Structures are given as C-alpha cells and as structure tokens.
C-alpha cells in the first residue's frame, strides 16, 4: 500500500479524486485508507484483493471493514471497541482538539502489545489547511511542514517496544 498512497499523494488534489484512485487500483491485502483534503472533505476506502473497494463517508477506520471476518484478530486488536470509542468521541463528546488527539496515545487507541505482533508505532496529526502535520509518540511530538518539507530523522523510545 505505500506505493498506492504515494501515487494518491502525488496525483490527487481532493478526497474525491483520491477515492476514485483507491477504488480502481488493486491491492494485495485488505487495507482501510481514510483521506482528508484541504476543504475538510473526507472518505474512507475499504480495499481488498478479493472484492471491489468500498468508498464510504466514514470518518474513522480501524482493523476491520464493514463486517468482522477474522474474529480472533478482531478480539486481539480490539478493532470494534476502538471504532466505537472513536465514533463516540466524534459524535457525542466534542472534545477539545488536544484532548481528542491525546486520546490516540492512550488505551484503547494506543497499544503496547508489540510482543504479540500488534502495537502502536506513532500517531499522525494532519492539518491540511495549514499544510502541517505532526508525528506523535508518548512524550514526543515532531512537527513538520508540508509546504516546506525538510527531511529528517528522530530516535524515539516507544513504550513497550523491544
């Protein structure tokens, strides 16, 4: 999927254009991709190798698509619980921006289950109107400009990682 996302970033201006690309480009595995453009239009593409992509107006995506197909994986990753948590925060609570973003670095959204093959590496915060983004880890934030991107590297200690 990295090549597909790179293509989308280089060729699409809007969420709609990105959705059209994601709907037609084949993928070797199932992926959920949520897209946001400068005008705050968004969509989620549920892509899979064995069926046509489904483009939705969902504002969130976790580790399952429309229905849970792999129950043990869903339990292990808490995909349904994380989706419900996010939807509840968006629809019912209207948290201030920093509180909402901070929730991505705490359970149930943040996981340190690296030894079991599932952990959160980082959280990305995108601000398309400002042409800015941040990568966040517990205790560390790396702010980046999308208008004047400067390549760089960071060494971060990820809690729970080997």
Regions found by a protein language model. Name each.
Residues 1-162:
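C-terminal, well-structured catalytic/ligand-binding subdomain of enzymes
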């Amino acid at each position: 999927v990295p090549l597909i996302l790179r293509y989308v970033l280089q060729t699409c201006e809007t969420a709609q254009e990105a959705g059209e690309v994601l709907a037609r480009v084949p993928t070797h595995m199932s992926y959920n991709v949520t897209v946001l453009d400068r005008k705050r239009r968004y969509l989620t593409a549920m892509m899979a190798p064995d069926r046509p992509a489904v483009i939705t107006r969902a504002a969130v995506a976790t580790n399952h698509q429309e229905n849970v197909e792999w129950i043990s994986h869903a339990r292990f990753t808490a995909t349904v619980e994380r989706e419900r948590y996010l939807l509840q925060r968006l629809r019912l609570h209207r948290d201030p921006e920093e509180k909402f973003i901070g929730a991505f670095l705490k359970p149930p959204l943040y996981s340190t289950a690296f030894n079991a093959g599932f952990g959160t590496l980082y959280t990305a915060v995108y601000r398309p109107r400002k042409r800015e983004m941040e990568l966040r880890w517990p205790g560390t934030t790396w702010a980046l400009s999308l208008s004047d991107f400067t390549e760089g590297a960071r060494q971060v200690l990820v809690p729970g990682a080997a």
